[in-house]
Amino acid sequence: MEYITNYTLGELKERFKGLGLEPYRAKQVFRWIYKKFITDFARMTDLSKEHRKLLSENFQFHPLEKLDRVEAPDAIKYLFKTIDNHIVETVLIKERDHYTLCVSSQIGCAVGCTFCATALDGLKRNLTTAEIIDQYIQVQQDLGEEKIRNVVFMGMGEPLANYENVKKAVEIMISSEGLDLSKRRITISTSGIISQLKRMAQDEVMREVNLAVSLNAVSQKAREELMPLTKTNTLKELMEVLKSFPLPKYRRITLEYVLIKGVNDSVKDAEKLAKLIGKHKKRFKVNLIPFNPDPNLPYERPSLTDIMKFQKVLWKHGISNFVRFSKGIEVFGACGQLRAKRLKLEIEGAVK
């Protein structure tokens, strides 16, 4: 049986035609799912009993099963299980006056960043569109009256390596009949796959959302050590692509920079980062992210003094920047950490 949340509105209209249903019925169903977050055909009361029966015989809703919900003052971490028994992480970030949802796009990751817990287990597979959307639906159902305002593709996986499914999820998110999110409220974070960035630049849907690029180093050699994909996606070519990437008015590309003690956090590194950006200050803003400590990774967080020194250099050069301390440290909030803990406990339990 198919998952109905795998379909964009246009696709669902075509699918409904094949079932003998009028295309406008797809809009009705979309509104129930994405406006009221009803995931039970029996409750869709503007459909006839016959139509509800037909839909329930052909479609189902939740490809994810909620395993765990761990709450801290500034974030809620959800663990979901797929039908093939993989674990997916989702984080709901509590901002001052709204919520931001951090969704995963893959199970594991093939990029292999040495500072990321998700990379420890390698890539298992891409998430389907339904699995991406179901993260949103189940968290919103859990929230009730309060609404998710922003979505960031910054969870497990490389979104641009799962391009088609991520794009379909974005289409559902921005559809006026779907989640109806502003494109400005959606951010895709990528490690910098150059071929996919070029594809994104030509894509009328994808190029309109916010773009964040995980930079993390200011030289080819240093970036290769932290992010092995840099060997085939060079820093030089990446910056060239970003400097010509088509941007909506008043929008900037975010350069994400994970600050790691003794690795990339020196004043000299900050000066090199400023030089890398050069005259394109109005095109970029820098998101400084102090490393979130993990017992499985050989890195440490810089001191607050060193973080401030790094930031001061960027301000000196007129580069817009901010420091983002990881939300949800109490609940293993960084990418892949709670999943890794859960897998470790399951393995230990099996051994016992």
Stretch-by-stretch model annotation:
Residues 92-93, 165:
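Residue-level structural signal for beta-strand termini and adjacent loop
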Residues 76, 88, 99-103, 111, ...:
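Generic beta-strand structural signal
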Residues 1-88, 94, 243-251, 257-352:
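Auxiliary Fe-S-binding modules of radical SAM enzymes
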Residues 94-134:
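Canonical Radical SAM [4Fe-4S] cluster-binding loop centered on the CxxxCxxC motif
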Residues 140-150, 155-317, 322:
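Conserved AdoMet/S-adenosylmethionine-binding subsite of the radical SAM
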Residues 69-70, 104-105, 189, 214:
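Short linear Ser/Thr-Pro motifs
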Residues 130, 134-144:
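Ferredoxin-type iron-sulfur electron-transfer modules in oxidoreductases and energy-metabolism complexes
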